[in-house]
Regions:
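Central cavity-lining transmembrane alpha-helices of secondary-active solute carriers
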Residues: 77-95
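Symmetry-related core transmembrane helices of the 12-TM Major Facilitator Superfamily/SLC fold
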Residues: 199-222
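Core transmembrane helices of Major Facilitator Superfamily
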Residues: 136-148
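Primarily marks hydrophobic transmembrane alpha-helices of the MFS/SLC 12-helix fold
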Residues: 104-107
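Glycine-rich segments within core transmembrane alpha-helices of 12-TM secondary carriers
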Residues: 165-188, 213
């Protein structure tokens, strides 16, 4: 009878409480407060670090690559299209890899790729190089897109999963608002300290989110639950 009760209790997803009582969030066995805080930390930075790559492109097109204004719209569209194709083509493989090797290396790897991508992007000297760097960055997009819902699914019991998704997506939006605007405002500052050199300004500007992404990657590598989901 006791075993039957334990089985029913596990299926109903009681779990351990986490966070404010009003949220009524409960986490799965083996998941600690540290793991949950790391999930929320990664959620805050995800959308902002993915979105800034689009925000920086007009400056790169105009000031670094000297792309004519009439060609910038089609170029931006092509970059987005190719990026989405790569995401669609790889996201299933990434999910399968995370089932085998764990969420931690994949999600931390996503932000490491973002970091390297932001270092490379302003170094592009041709549209072809920029496209190659954007496709490399898109691999990180696929990894981040796949891992956030996967980690949520692993960490919350079934009854709390919807609420945790809402919290994480709220942090996504909050991070987008609080991070993207300050990053945009850094460009005039960097233009000032390099005496108006657009190439150097672009590099310093994009290397700022590169540093942020490296810190996030390190935090995820330290704080997420180790092992594959079954472990």
């Amino acid at each position: 009878m006791n075993r039957l009760n334990e089985s029913v209790e596990g299926a109903s997803g009681v779990g351990e409480p986490f966070g404010p009582r009003k949220l009524n969030l409960r986490i799965a066995p083996g998941v600690t407060t540290g793991h949950m805080m790391t999930l929320l930390f990664g959620s805050f930075f995800g959308i902002a670090m993915m979105g800034f790559i689009n925000a920086c492109q007009p400056y790169l097109f105009t000031e670094v690559l000297n792309v004519p204004t009439a060609e910038q719209g089609p170029l931006a569209g092509n970059l987005t299209f190719l990026s989405e194709i790569l995401v669609v083509a790889t996201i299933g493989i990434i999910g399968a890899m995370s089932d085998k090797f764990g969420r931690k290396p994949i999600w931390a790897g996503a932000f490491l790729i973002f970091s390297i991508g932001y270092v490379l992007y302003p170094l592009a000297q041709t549209v072809e190089q920029l496209t190659a760097f954007r496709l490399f960055f898109a691999l990180g997009l696929a990894m981040n897109t796949a891992m956030l819902p996967s980690v949520i699914n692993d960490y919350a019991v079934e009854a709390s999963r919807g609420r945790l998704i809402s919290v994480c997506f709220m942090l996504n939006g909050l991070g987008f608002i609080l991070l993207l605007t300050p990053l945009r405002l850094l460009l005039p500052y960097f233009e000032g300290i390099v005496d108006g050199d657009p190439v150097l300004a672009a590099r310093y500007w994009l290397w700022t989110p590169a540093a942020v992404c490296l810190l996030v990657s390190t935090g995820l590598l330290i704080g997420l639950k180790p092992g594959a989901p079954a472990q």
